[in-house]
Amino acid sequence: MAGVGEGDSGGVERDDIGMVAASPVASRVNGKVDADVVGRFATCCRALGIAVYQRKRPPDLAAARSGFAALTRVAHDQCDAWTGLAAAGDQSIGVLEAASRTATTAGVLQRQVELADNALGFLYDTGLYLRFRATGPDDFHLAYAAALASTGGPEEFAKANHVVSGITERRAGWRAARWLAVVINYRAERWSDVVKLLTPMVNDPDLDEAFSHAAKITLGTALARLGMFAPALSYLEEPDGPVAVAAVDGALAKALVLRAHVDEESASEVLQDLYAAHPENEQVEQALSDTSFGIVTTTAGRIEARTDPWDPATEPGAEDFVDPAAHERKAALLHEAELQLAEFIGLDEVKRQVSRLKSSVAMELVRKQRGLTVAQRTHHLVFAGPPGTGKTTIARVVAKIYCGLGLLKRENIREVHRADLIGQHIGETEAKTNAIIDSALDGVLFLDEAYALVATGAKNDFGLVAIDTLLARMENDRDRLVVIIAGYRADLDKFLDTNEGLRSRFTRNIDFPSYTSHELVEIAHKMAEQRDSVFEQSALHDLEALFAKLAAESTPDTNGISRRSLDIAGNGRFVRNIVERSEEEREFRLDHSEHAGSGEFSDEELMTITADDVGRSVEPLLRGLGLSVRA
């Protein structure tokens, strides 16, 4: 393919990106530019206020536009004529297409009238926050691509991408071309490609302030549209900057990400400030008045599954999308769940219950696939037991099983407590609860200490509103939501009695017993091993004696209810605290030993936790829990 100024192609030249351009013949005679064309070009340039033959006059844009429009009719093959028309204010897609098409002649007329380098050019809108100046062939191609992308049609996106791809292949590091690639993919809602393009660019120290601001807001928005809210927020946290439109878009995106994170209070603050500054912005007004207004998310897989890569309308919805890697991922999830379940120390009955649960769901789905009658079953669960007995971890295992079997689309688990659901004002609780449930859809909502929702016993407790909202959503989203409630058995029974609809939806119970002292010692040994630590034997004996005493004693909890002291300590959670605190005691002991500063410690010394380390760690832990152990 002939490049710029290369070869002859029988009356048709091809520029460096493969676009067909008419040969410059109409305004040339025997290879020379027609003198009349040169004279008219000089007159038009003066009307733009550009120095011609080192002389200039005040600009007259109307005259320049009229003159260049007439010039393009007689010199339609001259890029400089089209560039002048764009500089005079006509940046219609036809003009920009012509400038791109005739780009191989750029500079021909300018040299005839001795224009300074880059004197003739125009600013064009990229279609997303930034404007670039076009003075040369590749600039004109980008300006045309931007105009194509601004029309918003799949065919135009494809054409624009073809134009820009030809440039980036030759000039991979040119930021202007990379930004146009971002713009095209942004407008076509190809968010994963926007992220790929911007990630290596966004922290470039050579970016000017406006470019850096635009890049961060665009990347944050793309990440949010992919449902990657935490990384999105890192780019949207400070949305202000030199690009005013980007600052508004960034603040709105930040608010909606906070809403997706179920931080409605912070989202509302951002929206209120934004609305005060921009009351004319309809999206901001809608987001402020409607708490269900949020970010529409997709996935890279769904984007790639489009029948037309540039048409968002051909993208499969979440319900219709079949991930080609889903089968392998589901099998991996089931295997992972089995391994995690097998690694648990104790909890034999819990393991059996979870295994039966898996079998029940698996066979239910098989019967459904065969067209056999399937009894309407609820998949919501009650996990009853004291703190630290593995309820949250088993909930994650159940989420993997449900997802691996295809009952749920995600293995995500959203763990919440009363404070996450309850608001301070009328209407706030319903909004917060709905937002929490929205974030848990297609996964598991894990409500720990569920009884706290109604612990006050007051008829006007907002917790009752949260329960009503939860029940309604469990019915309306029964195919997309699994709820697991957790807490002490007696407390959960009281909770289930507060609303007649709860018992019928939570029919499957799994009881989590307190660990035995021997099991807790096993847990301590395993935790230490995973951290490259080891308890000396006497330390393990002391731990078992401690756990046995705590298991035999009772202590009132914060509500005055007598509980096993070991349950108040937190069972497995208490063990983790002991391991971590004992390691700190070991480090302190070694740092104050005779070898401190020399580093002359054996691996055994660096790993061993002694009985004294344990003893010094346990006392402050028990004191912090309000517990004591009788001798």
Curated annotation (Swiss-Prot):
Recorded superkingdom: Bacteria
Gene Ontology MF, one: ATP hydrolysis activity
Subcellular location: Cytoplasm
Keywords carried by this UniProt record: ATP-binding, Cytoplasm, Nucleotide-binding
One GO CC annotation: cytosol
CDD domains on file: AAA
Up-regulation conditions: Repressed by IdeR in the presence of iron and by Zur in the presence of zinc.
Record flagged with keyword Coiled coil: no
Family of this protein: Belongs to the CbxX/CfxQ family.
Predominant subcellular localization, coarse grouping: cytoplasm
Summary of subunit composition and partner proteins: Part of the ESX-3 / type VII secretion system (T7SS), which is composed of cytosolic and membrane components.
Keyword set includes Cytoplasm: yes
Ligand binding (ATP): 385-392
Function: Part of the ESX-3 specialized secretion system, which is important for iron and zinc uptake or homeostasis. EccA3 exhibits ATPase activity and may provide energy for the export of ESX-3 substrates.
GO biological process assignments: cellular response to iron ion starvation; intracellular iron ion homeostasis; intracellular zinc ion homeostasis; siderophore-dependent iron import into cell
Protein name as catalogued: ESX-3 secretion system protein EccA3
